[in-house]
Design a protein with these regions (language model features):
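Structure-specific DNA junction-binding interface
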Residues: 1-85
């Protein structure tokens, strides 16, 4: 996500922030808490979650199917390993 267009990066991070504030989906906050508790910084935890958000958006657009909650949660649970690794 570091080489991403700055406007797109900010938008993805805004999605992450909104998910954390709304607790929707709750797995985003659970993942954030797990990452921070493991010693990952706030900023890095948000960036990692943003990578999962961007990966899910890519999959939705590529497959022309609705958001897949199970796939999203599976990717969150694997962090800090990124979806494409």
């Amino acid at each position: 996500m570091d080489k991403m267009n700055p406007v797109l990066k900010q938008t993805i991070l805004e999605v992450v922030n909104n998910q954390l504030e709304a607790l929707d989906p709750p797995e985003t906050k659970q993942t954030y808490d797990r990452l921070v508790a493991s010693g990952i910084s706030d900023q890095e935890a948000r960036r990692l979650i943003g990578c999962v958000v961007s990966s899910e958006i890519f999959d939705v657009l590529k497959q022309q199917q609705p958001f897949n909650h199970a796939r999203f949660v599976k990717a969150l649970n694997k962090l800090p390993i990124l979806p494409w690794e």
